[in-house]
Structure formats: structure tokens, C-alpha cells
């Protein structure tokens, strides 16, 4: 089953993306490099809980 997750910017801007993840194939925390428009550069986004 795919679960919804939130990817939060490590630049400290508060910008986030939402996506889904298959927990069986990827049990660890997700880290991916994506574009943060507030700082206008690609930064690492880390997985966080959706509240």
C-alpha cells in the first residue's frame, strides 16, 4: 500500500512537497533533491509526517 508523505526543505524555508511512497520497497526515510522556489535552488528534501 502506498502511504502519503510530506517532503520538507532542509533550507529552512518551510516549503514542502507531498507525494506517496511504497513502505514495503523503501522502509527508510526518503531523501531527494528537488527545487525550492523560495531560495531558487535545488536542495535536499527530507521525509516528514503529514499532520
From Swiss-Prot:
It comes from Psychrobacter sp. (strain PRwf-1). GO terms for biological process: translation. This is Large ribosomal subunit protein bL33. InterPro entries: Ribosomal_bL33 (IPR001705), Ribosomal_bL33_CS (IPR018264), Ribosomal_bL33_sf (IPR038584), Ribosomal_zn-bd (IPR011332). Belongs to the bacterial ribosomal protein bL33 family. GO terms for molecular function: structural constituent of ribosome. The gene is rpmG. One of its GO terms (cellular component) is cytosolic large ribosomal subunit. Gene3D superfamilies: Ribosomal protein L33. Keywords: Ribonucleoprotein, Ribosomal protein. The keyword Ribonucleoprotein applies. HAMAP family: Ribosomal_bL33. The keyword Ribonucleoprotein applies.
Amino acid at each position: 500500500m502506498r502511504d502519503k508523505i510530506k517532503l520538507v526543505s532542509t533550507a529552512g524555508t518551510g516549503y514542502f512537497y507531498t507525494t506517496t511512497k511504497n513502505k514495503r520497497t523503501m522502509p527508510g526515510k526518503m531523501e531527494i533533491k528537488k527545487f525550492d522556489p523560495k531560495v531558487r535552488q535545488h536542495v535536499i528534501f527530507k521525509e516528514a509526517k503529514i499532520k
